[in-house]
Amino acid sequence: WLAYHLSGSPFTVGMVAFASQIPVLVCAPFFGVWVDRVDSLQLVRWAQVLAMAQSAALAVFTFSGHMTVPLLLGLCFVQGFINALDWPARQALVFRLAGDRAVLDNVIALNSITFNLCRLVGPAIGGLLIAAWGPGVVFALDAVSYLAVLAALAAVRLAPPVKRLRVAHPLVELRDAVRYAWAHPTIRRVLSVVPIIGLVGFAHTVLAPVFARDLFGGDARTLGFLLSATGAGSLAAGIWLSLGRSAEGMARVVAWGALIGGTGLAVMAAHSSLALALVCYGAAGCGAALVMVPSNTILQSNVDDDKRGRVMALFTMGQSLYPVGSLLIGALAEGVGPKVAVAICGGVCIATAATFWRASGLAMAGGRHGSPP
């Protein structure tokens, strides 16, 4: 919202999303090598400290009236660099906290519920706060909220991770992880679909400020409602997944997720009703969660422990094609209009679902080291 307020340009909105995510795309694989070498809990703790400092900087510059588009882009880039460290370490930490592969799918689903509950409540509260007092208050509250996260992490006690006996050059270890992922049919299949959804499956969130103000004539509160609808859909998907799904069925869930998300985008592009848009935003959020959460579970259940950080970094990298998609979607929206841009993205998601569906029934058939179809 702040980017659109400062510039009035959908392309700038896409640039902000690009700046906040592109460091994840570039740096996450290398941080994944680091995650496999050191204590993931300590990495997550330090990442929260850095994130708190970044949010505080956003608040200071916004309150002082010195915020500009270049400065906002720079701080978003810093946020992306922090996320590149935090996300692979967090995925490895989730597995350590679970302690048992048998309950891993439920743990990942519950983690998704927590995350998406925040996405559901946060944007609505944020929209109201922005409308009442401006974005600086939101940034300040975000910075303060990290104190609770740090307190919770300080209370976590885990046995030190087993140190690897052989440590090669980081580039060699990264190459080995890519070869391992490509040679493993199940991992390869999942890591093929995730980047596509990461690229085009979140078009609705990229263009949410544009839809909120220009299509529906709303303000920050309208934006908050749209993003909360996305969070509600993701939350519903997480709750459904937490009820228990067999590993064999997770691949089909991924295909259904791409189909549901793509359909939501396509329907939204064909209508101008805010009420219907909220439903479509919910469907798109649900679809994205039904792709990403089961993909996470499939990978965590199949990867060898000594390669977990690197493979999950590749997963994070696939998710983080979002910034590239943000840039392309922003440019596409300026050229052909936001509705056409969203329709194209929906079509790509539906095509991805159809392609993945053919292989999904055999994706887990070979067990932990599944064989190709």
Placement of each model-derived feature along the sequence:
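Hydrophobic alpha-helical transmembrane segments
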Residues: 69-80, 106-164, 204, 221-222, ...
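Pair of pore-lining "gating" transmembrane helices in MFS-fold secondary transporters
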Residues: 1, 77, 183-202, 282
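Transmembrane alpha-helix termini and helix-breaking/packing motifs in multi-pass membrane transporters
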Residues: 1-7, 59-64, 121-141, 214-215, ...
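Paired intracellular helix-loop junctions of major facilitator superfamily
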Residues: 96-104, 301-308
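Hydrophobic core of transmembrane alpha-helices in multi-pass small-molecule transporters
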Residues: 67-85, 195, 276-290
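Juxtamembrane intracellular "pre-TM" segments in multi-pass secondary transporters
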Residues: 158-192
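C-terminal transmembrane bundle of multi-pass solute transporters/carriers
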Residues: 16, 26-30, 37, 43, ...
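Extracellular/periplasmic helix-loop-helix junction of adjacent transmembrane segments
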Residues: 1-22
